[in-house]
Amino acid sequence: MEETTPPLQAGSKPHLEKLTLGVTRILESSPGVTEVSIIEKLPAERHVISSWEQKNNCVMPEDVRNFYLMTNGFHMTWSVKLDEHIIPLGSMVINGISKLTQLIQSSVYSLPNAPTLADLEDDTQEGNEDHQLEKPHFDCRSAIFELDSCNGNGKVCLVYKNGKPGLAHDTEIWFLDRALYWHFLTDTFIAYYRLLITHLGLPQWQYAFTSYGISPQAKQWFSMYKPITYNTSLLTEESDNFANKLDPSKVFKSKNKILIPKKKGPVPPASGQKGPGPLPPPTSKPTTGSGNPVRK
């Protein structure tokens, strides 16, 4: 059973700052962002990892093993404040070992003559844009373990390409969308973890690696809180260098505007006579403190 502690503020402990690659500083300095927190998890014991390997007949990759020896799972969240309402937005999750379970036939399909996951297998690679890569299989040809359920938007999976017994060097990270199509993400777990952090856990960010991309609503959040993709060096720089296409300071600006009195124009003469337009003020003559020309 995984042991956890109450959520902590992201910058409250140095090792948590190291675990998040410093991205918490960027989030905390972004306009409108609030409640950046991490659920701290204790490291997994070695015998727990060995037990998982024996149970699943798979050797855990070295980078995955090192991750669990540092923290038994990862859960970081952040919210935004809009019109006094706090909206949960970012979510970064890596399942703990107890939830690193194999993706198998759902009980929904347990009825007689019901379709199975194996029925989705075909030889056409339809829906998979990575034609040069062999996609995972739902049958015994692959062993698939769930790393993140993506809040119901799909599943990020650790895939043993050649089934069981699973070898550490035969693993890849794939994304299974809601239509049950596979999309390749990274060769290694540590590379996926960097993607997770640099995309700030924005909703549906995994769909950026599909042929159809993210939804229009997710694009709005992406434009406001631009992911730090493909340039992890920005994570260690000052937050002043982090810029967005939109200016969030204007989006979250207070509605209480300061009224600025308008300057009054020249007062027309009391008489009703029409005369030529007002003459421009002389430039060479001295003026008083009130700005009116001095007559001689």
Curated annotation (Swiss-Prot):
Keywords: Cytoplasm, Cytoskeleton, Microtubule. It comes from the Eukaryota. The keyword Ribosomal protein does not apply. GO terms for cellular component: centriolar satellite; cytosol; microtubule. Coiled coil: none annotated. Its main location: cytoplasm. Residues 254-265 have a biased composition (Basic residues). It is found in: Cytoplasm, Cytoskeleton; Cytoplasm, Cytoskeleton, Microtubule organizing center, Centrosome, Centriolar satellite. PANTHER family: TUBULIN POLYGLUTAMYLASE COMPLEX SUBUNIT 2. Subunit of the tubulin polyglutamylase complex (TPGC). The complex mediates cilia and flagella polyglutamylation which is essential for their biogenesis and motility. This is Tubulin polyglutamylase complex subunit 2.
